[in-house]
Amino acid sequence: MIGTTALLLIAPGAALTLAQPPAPAPALPADLVAAIQRDLGLSPAQYLDRAETGQNLVRFADSMRATFPESFAGAWLDADGTPMVGLADGIDKAAARTAVEAAGYQVRDQQHSERALLDQFGQLSDWIRNLPSELSGHVKGASIDPVHNDIALKTDAAAQGQGLQLPDFLGFVRVILGSLGSAQQPTTQPPVTTTTAPPVTTTTTSPTTTTTEPPVTTTAPQPPAHDAMLGGDPYSADGLNACSLGFNGTDHSGNVVNISAGHCDPNGQNAGTPDATVAYEGNSHDGSVHTPRFGTFDKTVTDNVDFSVIKIDKEVAGRFKNNFVRVPGGDPLPITGIADPLVGAPVCKSGEKAGFNCGTISDVNQTLVIDDYRTLKDSFVATVACALPGDSGGPVVTGTMALGISSAGDSPTQADCDNWHYTNVWATPIKAILAADAGLKVRTN
């Protein structure tokens, strides 16, 4: 949990109970503070408080989803960071409203419950699956939108001209024109364009989060060594792809690893074998300039969940035994926990090209199909100031908590952030990665 609560202390012989002032907020690196102020218009304390508020709301939403399934209609932070809980008409609405107000949250009356939206989501999936290929090719993705209380179906601009019309029974679906994005990195790979595929599966699940916390590896809050390798630092995969390190951690056998993006590995089929892709420091290894190697890809996944596990060579393992992320050459940010994505929550991403850039989450549990190369399912979308090729695999945080790994963006050809504009970044939730690899852990305080 980010932040602290006041502690009640009784001094020997004292007649009064005194409240100790709250501890100061964790110190944030200057590069991150600048990004928070520039991109979010928040102070560091406001950013940390809003991130914590979001995680508290996630846990409350999980309990509401289980206790009041007939009326619960989603939860989010509004533009001012106010926690909102949607409620639809149902036999349990009065009790649900009492629970929301008792928790100090605001209620928004909505027309459809989350359960009804999930049912419509399944019908939409079936409808897309049965479309002829010349029409399904214009569908780019879909997700439940708790704020608008509907389903956002994203298509390309040519969809309506090709006769793509929603049937009457899909009454909760809102069509949005525009591509869902393309691969934002690696820098030496040609940009990947999106193609179509059903944006949802036949078996729909509630957009809930795992209430039991995944295991973490605890480390002491000590500053990193001068030669330490941190999340956000650049690396090269066999000289073919330049990416960013993600979160440091350990695997099921206790080996030191770094968790990055799966599509950064150009030979993913060889992961975990003697022919596995070698990871090199920096982004200049091209076969002629040999920067030092630091590990090999032990596991690579690009289908549905985009992640890689880079097993660190024993000779340099000590350099990765830390829980920090940063922009290359900058001061470190300690990772203190693991978080869930929530619409409206503040996020900041670190990458070796764009550095720290911040924004808010606009979608959760979204599916994105990128050519024949990879598919993202249950990804979250953050609208951030800038994302550049080379940022893939880098860490996405909310507050000081690990949230996800950068996977794709909709500005793959942007060269720099000099004329930065807000862009969408798709990220794979860190909890989805840990669930897909038993025993994998993220280092935290």
Regions found by a protein language model. Give the residues of each.
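Short solvent-exposed strand/turn elements
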Residues: 259-268, 315, 373-390
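Helical hairpin unit composed of two closely spaced alpha helices linked by a short loop
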Residues: 359-384, 392-393, 411
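Short glycine/threonine-rich beta-strand-turn micro-motifs
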Residues: 27, 31-34, 38, 48-49, ...
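C-terminal subregion of chymotrypsin/trypsin-like serine protease catalytic domains
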Residues: 398-445
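Non-catalytic extracellular/periplasmic "stalk"
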Residues: 99-100, 109-186, 220-259, 297
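Serine endopeptidase catalytic core focused on the charge-relay Asp
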Residues: 227-368, 397-399, 403
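Secretory targeting and sorting signals
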Residues: 1-21
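Extracellular mucin-like PTS domains
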Residues: 187-219
